[in-house]
Amino acid sequence: MATSAPLRSLEEEVTCSICLDYLRDPVTIDCGHVFCRSCTTDVRPISGSRPVCPLCKKPFKKENIRPVWQLASLVENIERLKVDKGRQPGEVTREQQDAKLCERHREKLHYYCEDDGKLLCVMCRESREHRPHTAVLMEKAAQPHREKILNHLSTLRRDRDKIQGFQAKGEADILAALKKLQDQRQYIVAEFEQGHQFLREREEHLLEQLAKLEQELTEGREKFKSRGVGELARLALVISELEGKAQQPAAELMQDTRDFLNRYPRKKFWVGKPIARVVKKKTGEFSDKLLSLQRGLREFQGKLLRDLEYKTVSVTLDPQSASGYLQLSEDWKCVTYTSLYKSAYLHPQQFDCEPGVLGSKGFTWGKVYWEVEVEREGWSEDEEEGDEEEEGEEEEEEEEAGYGDGYDDWETDEDEESLGDEEEEEEEEEEEVLESCMVGVARDSMKRKGDLSLRPEDGVWALRLSSSGIWANTSPEAELFPALRPRRVGIALDYEGGTVTFTNAESQELIYTFTATFTRRLVPFLWLKWPGTRLLLRP
């Protein structure tokens, strides 16, 4: 009770006479009375004159209103005493925990000194050090910073929303991609199952045809065997009778010689065809089907492997590397050989002696594929004539019957002369082997000046093609397919695998594979010394 009376007395001293509450931001007017700043603004002037004090009724000027800092600090201390009345000694109040206190005066910090950038209590604000400085209420000083923080917070929230949106969209894209992969998995299984079913049906169909041909051949074999046995039995009977007749005495033999011989006239012995013409035609057609099957499966396997394993690339030629003997098209995908050297300026990257040219695009990794088309005047006509000759030979073979008359055909002098002419033509073709072209890959750092061997040790992996056949440009040179002239050569480069594979792009037939360890950039390589021939890059 002793301590509560002084506290109540102090509370009465710091109570505003207008709002009857603690003085908030206390100010004094001209008469000396003290009120809350907000309460003085509510005091209205009487009959248009200056406002008057609510206690003494003396007029005052609002511009003379001055803050009372010490009284504001006293109000805070009274409030703290009132709160700390039931607190144990040494216990820190919640307000002291939540609010920072002035280290010097242990008062609550209310102001912010804009000159020093420090937080001040009421006593620091009235001190000689900070009185001439500009000090504002801490909440007012914090407002611009709070607005900046709120603006930055708004930006961060927008960024967060964007990230969440991106994340949601990305998650949706991933789920869609996974769904697409699942659909593709089902598609692959279904397509391959359909392909397997189709191949199984074709297999069963071919095996049924084969079984029918086997049955027809077996039945024909029995007929052929039975006919032969009957013919042999007939001949054996005639031979036996004639042998007996030949052993008779002359007198007996001469009695009915004419009649006997008339009973057994000389007949041409039977020469039957072991395979009927119809069956032979069917077997030939079946063999053609198997060849078509083999060719189709090879082409399918080659194309599927190429499309799935290798990336088909479009390559062009580098005009700066082209020899003066070569002429490039405007799109740099076609090269033609000219016998005259047309380059007026020798570029440092240009081939000077060898009629070669490199590709403009190089490869240092991956599996890539492109094709080179060889256009040679007269090749198509020659091949068509060759196809017609082969068809004629097949027709002649089909027209041949059985065993004939039991004699073999021997070569005549004319045949020997024709063979000799063919040998002379082969020798002439060997002499013309210099007219050829090369297709393949090469290191972009290969030598380009002087005479070159153009072999793997020089950084070139290529095939040489001519009218006489195909050679692998190895050391020594390896002849691959004599007289084979592919119109399109496929080049498959597996950089990491260290292989360069050449195929017939039309039939997918393997021609040759180089193996090496690649460490430099590789580019397409063409070499052409063959008048009337063009090399075109595809696609």
From Swiss-Prot:
A zinc finger (RING-type) spans 16-57. E3 ubiquitin-protein ligase which regulates the IFN-beta production and antiviral response downstream of various DNA-encoded pattern-recognition receptors (PRRs). Also plays a central role in determining the response to different forms of oxidative stress by controlling levels of DNA glycosylases NEIL1, NEIL3 and NTH1 that are involved in repair of damaged DNA. Promotes nuclear IRF3 ubiquitination and proteasomal degradation. Bridges together TBK1 and NEMO during the innate response to viral infection leading to the activation of TBK1. Interacts with TBK1; this interaction bridges together TBK1 and NEMO in order to activate TBK1. Interacts with INCA1. This is Tripartite motif-containing protein 26. Keywords: Coiled coil, Cytoplasm, Immunity, Innate immunity, Metal-binding, Nucleus, Transferase, Ubl conjugation, Zinc, Zinc-finger. A zinc finger (B box-type) spans 97-138. One of its GO terms (biological process) is host-mediated suppression of symbiont invasion. Residues 380-434 have a biased composition (Acidic residues). The keyword Nucleus applies. It is found in: Cytoplasm; Nucleus. It catalyses: S-ubiquitinyl-[E2 ubiquitin-conjugating enzyme]-L-cysteine + [acceptor protein]-L-lysine = [E2 ubiquitin-conjugating enzyme]-L-cysteine + N(6)-ubiquitinyl-[acceptor protein]-L-lysine. Zn(2+) binds at C102, H105, C124, H130. Residues 295-539 form the B30.2/SPRY domain. Residues 376-437 are annotated as: Disordered. SUPFAM superfamilies: B-box zinc-binding domain, Concanavalin A-like lectins/glucanases, RING/U-box. Its EC number is 2.3.2.27. Autoubiquitinates upon viral infection. In turn, autoubiquitinated TRIM26 recruits NEMO and bridges TBK1-NEMO interaction. It is an enzyme of class 2 (transferase). PROSITE patterns: B302_SPRY, ZF_BBOX, ZF_RING_2. GO terms for cellular component: cytoplasm; nucleus. One of its GO terms (molecular function) is ubiquitin protein ligase activity.
